Amino acid sequence: MPPKQAQSKKTVEKEKKKKVEDKTFGLKNKNKSKKVAAYVSQVEAQVKHSGLQNKEAALKEKAKRDKELAEKAKKEAESILVNTIVQSKVPLGVDPKSIVCEYFKQGVTCPKGNRCKFAHDLAAGRKSEKIDIYTDRRKDEDTMENWDEAKLKSVVEKKRTTENKAKPTAIICKFFLDAIESKKYGWFWECPNGGEKCAYQHCLPEGYQLKKKKSREEDEVEEIPIEELIEEERAKLTKSTPVTLETFLRWKEEKRLQKEKAAKDAQDKRLADIKAGKTSMSGREMFVFNPDLFVDDESAIDTKSKEYEKSEEEIAALANQINTSLFTDGGVLPSDDDDDDDDDDDDDEDGDDEEEDDDEEEGEYEEEEASDE
C-alpha cells in the first residue's frame, strides 16, 4: 500500500481557519469587546500550535514506551542471569560482610535485598584486606606499564639529571613509623612529608620489631611453674645426699637448734638495748624478766575470797539506798511507821480542838442563864 501524501500548507491553513470559525461561531462584538477579542486570539493560538503539541506528546509517549520496553528486557535478562549466578561460600571464621555479593557484583538486583548477609559494596573486599607494612606500595603502583608518553619523558629527563646524585636512602620515614605505632596506617594514609614524593622508605625491613610489640612481649614473660623451677635447681646441684629417716631427723634437729639460738640471740640483744636505755620494756617483758614485781604483799586484797562476798539482801539494801539518795539529796526517806505516827498526831490535835469548842459552848450557855436570872 503506497504511503499517504502529506497535506499542503494551504489545506492545513484552511483547516485551522475553519476550526477557529467553528469555535468562535455565534460570538457577538468580536471586533469591539476586548474580552471577546482576547478569547478569539487565545483560540487561534491553540489551533496554530496544536500540531506542535501533538508532536511533543507523541514523542513523550514514544520515549515512555521505549523505557518500559528497556526495563522489561532488563528484567528478563536478569531473570535469566539470576539462575546462573552462584553465591560464594563463606569460609569458617570469616565475616560475610567482608565478601561482596555476587548478584551485586554482576549488577543484578539481589533477590534478598537488605536481608542479604553479604556486602553490597564493591570496596568491601579492599577494606577487609590487611595492608602489608613490609612492602612500599609506591613501588608496586608506579610501574612502567602504567606510564604514558609524558611520564616516560619526565622519567628519562630525571634520570639524566640525577645520574651523579646519591642513591635513594634506606632510612625509614619517621611519619610512617609513627602511623604504624599509633595504628593510623592504612590504605588511605598519606605521608605528611610530601605524600608520594617522600624520599624515605615507607616499609619495614624484615625482622623489624615494633616498640609496642616489644614492650608487650616483655610484659607477657611466661612464668616458670614451681615444679620446673625445683627440677632446674635440683639439676644444678653437684653433690647430693640421699634423704633417709636418719638424715631427715638430723637435719630437723639442726634446724631446731638454729631456731632456738636465733631466738636467744634476739632476746639477749633486746635485753641489752633495754638496759642501755635505747628502748622501753613492755608489760609482758617486765613480767618475764622480773616476775618478783608482780608478787602480792601482805596488804594485798583478794576480791574473789568469801570474805568479800555479799548476800542478795545486802545487795538489795545497797541498791535501795542508792535509789533513795537520788531523790532526797543524801537524806533518808520516811518509813511507813513514820506515816502512822503522823496520822495519830493529827487525830489528837483534832480531838483537842473539839474539846475546846465544847468548853466554849458550855461557858456561853452558863452566861446566858445567869443573865436571865
Swiss-Prot record:
A GO biological-process term: cytoplasmic translation
GO CC annotation terms, alphabetical: cytosol
Bias type Acidic residues, positions: 335-373
Chain segments annotated as coiled-coil in the UniProt record: 252-326
Zinc finger (C3H1-type): 95-123, 167-205
Signal peptide: none
Transmembrane feature ranges: none
Region called Disordered, residue ranges: 1-27, 325-373
Protein's UniProt keywords contain Heme: no
Basic and acidic residues: bias regions: 10-25
Disulfide bridges in this chain: none
Family membership noted in the UniProt record: Belongs to the ZC3H15/TMA46 family.
Protein name in UniProt: Zinc finger CCCH domain-containing protein 15 homolog
Organism: Dictyostelium discoideum
